[in-house]
Amino acid sequence: MASYFALVLNGISMVFSQGLFPLYTIPDHLGPWTPIDLSHLHCPNNLYTDASYCTTEQSITYTELKVGSSVSQKIPGFTCTGVRTESVTYTNFVGYVTTTFKKKHFPPKSRDCREAYERKKAGDPRYEESLAHPYPDNSWLRTVTTTKDSWVIIEPSVVELDIYTSALYSPLFKDGTCSKSRTYSPYCPTNHDFTIWMPESENIRSACNLFSTSRGKLVRNRTSTCGIIDERGLFRSVKGACKISICGRQGIRLVDGTWMSFRYSEYLPVCSPSQLINTHDIKVDELENAIVLDLIRRREECLDTLETILMSGSVSHRRLSHFRKLVPGSGKAYSYINGTLMESDAHYIKVENWSEVIPHKGCLMVGGKCYEPVNDVYFNGIIRDSNNQILIPEMQSSLLREHVDLLKANIVPFRHPMLLRSFTSDTEEDIVEFVNPHLQDTQKLVSDMDLGLSDWKRYLLIGSLAVGGVVAILFIGTCCLRCRAGRNRRTIRSNHRSLSHDVVFHKDKDKVITSWESYKGQTAQ
């Protein structure tokens, strides 16, 4: 099955070079019709082949691209941004601690980014802890600054690898490209001065693991090499081939766009810039696989139909539709006319719209003109009904185009936040928007009173302060009582002194007596 996958992909390479898989194929001209027997029916060869008259064969080992490989290789990676968080604490006299957090950038190193990515990938809690604020230290009546470095990993970040030049392309990079070709642990600077891009795999050359080794036969004539028969038995001519390197490996590009690498000593020109393998068009592997699966399904249906025809000995118009060639090129056309199975040589061309085949009612366009049926029978199962409507079986089952439309509609790539805006110049003090969702918010914290003591010391201090307060209250109260008692004694003494010096008036005479002694003397008289 894998070999047939590769064979079919090689066969439709020319079709892809011209565009998507065709909606339908129809002959642009038909040869004369010839009666054939049922045993002459055969399923079409939907592969590109070439004829050669060379006879000398030599077994060789060659290298080819893996099935589904594309010139535009997707390299999964991640971005790493250096963020330094500072916590500034100040403890005042009574123990209040004020903490302020500040963030700024620093240029990260690839080694540290790789370690942070491995921790995040493994679910190591140390990565999440590194994004948290640093545990702030404090000292009484001092300002303490604590710093903590974080490496913010954002993934996925997918870039494109050019297998011709090994350059990386992405809008993340400065000038859109990164040409560093280091083998181990490479990194690329980005539009942000403090962010670098790194691949998920340390060895970026592993992304060029596009090759597979096969065995085939080198076909030669007496003078030169004619081509190579690959392991699937398909002859590949070297006529029109040119030299081209893929991921540093020298090889040749065949005329149909196939790349091979084998020992070839004859002269070949270097491929021009327009002669690239599959060009630079991005082809989704799922799209190619769906088309290949549909081709294989149709070939199996054709073989089943052929087996049914041979065993039953009967054929119908519907069954003849399975023998139509699905890709442009030379093939056969079949019809069932007047009870006779007919065959004609035909050259098929692609059809992208049904209007190209049926421009108006009753007209089947072949070779630029309306093809005349025989008894309302055309070829390859196409007939005309009584209402002059042309019926094509594949118009009801165009699965190939449905695959294309569905796959294109369902591809939603991840958009790295750096792609949403451009970053040209940033300072260390500015934290860019795409990093903020991964970090804690900067904030200012004020703690409760804390003298930096343990619990028992804190309780001892509180008890000592309480006892000291009681003693102070008692002392102040005692002092107040003593002061009041002393004040009262001084008041009494002053009153006694004032009485001894008071002036006495005699009631009989208006004579002033200046003292008690003089009063006693006067009364004695």
From Swiss-Prot:
SUPFAM superfamilies: Viral glycoprotein ectodomain-like. InterPro entries: PH_Rhabdo_glycop, Rhabdo_glycop_CD, Rhabdo_glycop_FD. The chain crosses the membrane at residues 460-480. The keyword Oxidoreductase does not apply. It holds the Pfam family Rhabdo_glycop_CD. Keywords: Glycoprotein, Lipoprotein, Membrane, Palmitate, Signal, Transmembrane, Transmembrane helix, Viral envelope protein, Virion. It is found in: Virion membrane. Glycosylated and palmitoylated by host. Glycosylation is crucial for glycoprotein export at the cell surface. A lipid is attached at residue 480 (S-palmitoyl cysteine). Residues 1-17 form the signal peptide. Primary surface antigen capable of inducing and reacting with virus-neutralizing antibodies. Almost all human and veterinary vaccines are based on the functional aspects of the G protein. It is a single-pass type I membrane protein. Residues 18-459 are virion surface. It comes from the Viruses. Belongs to the lyssavirus glycoprotein family. Its mutation dramatically attenuates the virus. Homotrimer. Interacts with matrix protein. Attaches the virus to host cellular receptor, inducing endocytosis of the virion. In the endosome, the acidic pH induces conformational changes in the glycoprotein trimer, which trigger fusion between virus and cell membrane. There is convincing in vitro evidence that the muscular form of the nicotinic acetylcholine receptor (nAChR), the neuronal cell adhesion molecule (NCAM), and the p75 neurotrophin receptor (p75NTR) bind glycoprotein and thereby facilitate rabies virus entry into cells. This is Glycoprotein. It comes from West Caucasian bat virus (WCBV).
